[in-house]
Curated annotation (Swiss-Prot):
This is Small ribosomal subunit protein uS11. Pfam families: Ribosomal_S11 (PF00411). Belongs to the universal ribosomal protein uS11 family. Gene3D superfamilies: Ribosomal protein S11. It comes from Lactobacillus delbrueckii subsp. bulgaricus (strain ATCC 11842 / DSM 20081 / BCRC 10696 / JCM 1002 / NBRC 13953 / NCIMB 11778 / NCTC 12712 / WDCM 00102 / Lb 14). The keyword RNA-binding applies. GO terms for cellular component: ribonucleoprotein complex; ribosome. The keyword Ribonucleoprotein applies.
Length: 129
């Protein structure tokens, strides 16, 4: 008896004109996620997903490459205008925003949504180098 063939569903490309770019920049990595206005993911990328390993993930260049990759994928799905929300203290914040603009997306607004603790958990100890 022959094995049944399973039909793979093709991924339907969404056509969204405007959306939100969420840039999460940590000390170790930079993640760029582009969503529609409701929050459904359209495209994403990160420095680690592009092959950067270790301390190279935390560089501004890695953040720039991650933003370019996510922007290219979003532009392929018809995105033109984005709002940018940046979270975290990492070094890739500015370069990721510049890369989104250079890729051809029109930035309408930039928000900093970094969470600020009202004296929450204890921070990591100071480094002694």
């Amino acid at each position: 008896m022959p094995a049944k063939k399973t039909a793979h569903k093709r991924r339907v490309k969404k056509h969204v004109e405007s959306g939100v770019a969420h840039i999460h920049s940590t000390f170790n990595n930079t993640l760029v996620m582009i969503t529609d206005v409701q929050g459904n993911a359209v495209a994403w990328s990160s420095a680690g997903a592009l092959g950067f390993k270790g301390s190279r993930k935390s560089t501004p260049f890695a953040a720039q490459m991650a933003a370019e990759a996510a922007a290219k994928s979003a532009i392929d799905q018809g995105m033109k205008h984005i709002e940018v929300s940046v979270k975290g203290p990492g070094s890739g914040r500015e370069s990721a925003i510049r890369a989104l603009q250079a890729a051809g997306l029109e930035i309408t607004s930039i928000r900093d949504v970094t969470p600020v603790p009202h004296n929450g958990s204890r921070p990591p100890k100071r480094r002694r180098v």
